[in-house]
Swiss-Prot record:
Signal peptide: none
Record field: transmembrane: 21-41, 73-93, 94-114, 132-152, 168-188, 199-219, 239-259, 263-283, 288-308, 338-358
Broadest EC class assigned to this enzyme: transferase
Gene designation: mraY
The entry's keywords: Cell cycle, Cell division, Cell inner membrane, Cell membrane, Cell shape, Cell wall biogenesis/degradation, Magnesium, Membrane, Metal-binding, Peptidoglycan synthesis, Transferase, Transmembrane, Transmembrane helix
UniProt subcellular location: Cell inner membrane
InterPro entries the record matches: Glycosyl_transferase_4, PNAcMuramoyl-5peptid_Trfase, PNAcMuramoyl-5peptid_Trfase_CS
NCBIfam families tied to this protein: mraY
Name listed for the protein in its UniProt record: Phospho-N-acetylmuramoyl-pentapeptide-transferase
Any one GO BP annotation for this protein: peptidoglycan biosynthetic process
An example Gene Ontology molecular-function term: UDP-N-acetylmuramoyl-L-alanyl-D-glutamyl-meso-2,6-diaminopimelyl-D-alanyl-D-alanine:undecaprenyl-phosphate transferase activity
Function: Catalyzes the initial step of the lipid cycle reactions in the biosynthesis of the cell wall peptidoglycan: transfers peptidoglycan precursor phospho-MurNAc-pentapeptide from UDP-MurNAc-pentapeptide onto the lipid carrier undecaprenyl phosphate, yielding undecaprenyl-pyrophosphoryl-MurNAc-pentapeptide, known as lipid I.
Family: Belongs to the glycosyltransferase 4 family. MraY subfamily.
PANTHER family: PHOSPHO-N-ACETYLMURAMOYL-PENTAPEPTIDE-TRANSFERASE, PHOSPHO-N-ACETYLMURAMOYL-PENTAPEPTIDE-TRANSFERASE HOMOLOG
Amino acid sequence: MLVWLAEYLVRYETAFNAISYITVRANLALLTALFISLWIGPKVIKRLQILKFGQEVRNDGPESHFAKKGTPTMGGVMILFSIGVSTLLWANLANPYIWVCLFVLFGYGAIGFVDDFRKITRKNTDGLIARWKYFWMSVVALVAILWLYWLGHDTDATRLVIPFFKDIMPQLGLFYIVLSYFVIVGTGNAVNLTDGLDGLAIMPTALVAGAFALIAWATGNVNFAEYLHIPYIKYSSEVVVFCTAIVGASLGFLWFNTYPAQVFMGDVGSLALGGALGVVAILVRQEFLLVIMGGVFVVEALSVILQVGSYKLRKQRIFRMAPIHHHFELKGWPEPRVIIRFWIISLMLVLMGLVTLKLR
């Protein structure tokens, strides 16, 4: 939005030309989202307390979690608000990719909001019926994917980029829709499953979003895209602003979500952030890198799949409890140790993912 204002004001003062640079707007988007999150955080927490929007806890979970019951939840609304305002202020709103990102973010956020609200009103951990939850997640994902397919049909925007192989980039055609569906829905659920400890999901989210900001910048620059042997995607550079807004909002939320948490993001935050990371990975054609950099999310989701599958087939559990972060808690690891170690692993995976861009 401010890009358009700057284009007008530059006629009178050339300093406003700085806002046309993506790097300037990306940094301003990060700072804006961070400050908004820090500013509204206490107000949101107080309002959630007044409304008695408290966290419900599983009866079969670790005993240390019983003390978390009643902690304000649905704090993800402050994340979404911060990202939304910052993106609308600093992104070029003529770019269609920005609207796709915001559509998925708020679409999944709305689904998560309903899920959280039902848990609170019913005073248990049961939210939306699973089939309806997946139905609406699928609807949002497919609308976004078809939108993107229409924008980039038969261009580099629908090619598959495979790490380590610079000359293998097959045109996906209609399979682009199938792959993109699993990426968005899968990432949304994976981040949702990871959000079980104070700050566990939000830091990896910030790290992955920060890495995707760098990748989006390179993908949207003809020279860097050619140098790294990755597709040049016409509209992708503006996605940098959206990614840095996620980083800023995530760090601002972490201020209140760090152990012991003053607020939880709830499904309204985790589903939205997961869906956002998924759609960004599709936009910059780096679905495989999302698996690497978001390895913590992948392992958390796989632990649940393996646990459920093993119990149904063999009546035996692989882990003491799933997702896997609860397994380590039940082994005696203090919650902060689990969180920090998962953060370290996430940082390592993000750095590994960035390195693969050059190893081709």
